[in-house]
Amino acid sequence: MPPKVTVDKASERAKQNLGTLIMRCRGTLSQSQLAKRVGLPRSNMKYIEDGVNAPTAEVYDKLIKELKPDLQTRQRMDRLYMAIRKVPPPDICRTITQNKDLVDAMRKLEGCNLTPSQIESVAALFASFQENREGEPIK
């Protein structure tokens, strides 16, 4: 008898919700047009929007670049992507890969749940690293 496959209900819901957000974000852009822009067959794009399949990291990255969701929608999409794939979004993975010493610093957080205040402090610190060409902080 074949082994039973456990279906993760939360992951299934997350795929459906992510697909719905992608569909809403594309607005007047057709499913075929979006599929072409991200390099997918239309049928694959349909499976993603229907919540049958989840986008790969590469496809998710392209979708974000094409759809340009507002901040709140992007945050929701990222959380859904993480719930499905169990990894950070591709842009965050790139940042960590480009800053290899960041891995050791982040390991110090293992087992910690940051408070909202601590998250704000970390966000402010990260924002301070963004500078324009004149060296002035970006507001």
Task: Annotate each language-model stretch with its function.
Residues 39-55, 62-63:
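Recognition helix of helix-turn-helix/homeodomain-like DNA-binding domains
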Residues 100-137:
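Short, low-complexity, charged amphipathic interaction modules
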Residues 2-28, 117-121, 125, 132:
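A short, Lys/Arg-rich alpha-helix, primarily the initiator
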Residues 3-4, 75-110:
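Short, charged recognition helix plus adjacent turn
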Residues 21, 44, 58-63, 88, ...:
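A general alpha-helix detector
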Residues 56-76, 83:
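DNA major-groove recognition helix of helix-turn-helix/homeodomain DNA-binding modules
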Residues 27-47, 77:
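Short alpha-helical DNA-recognition segment
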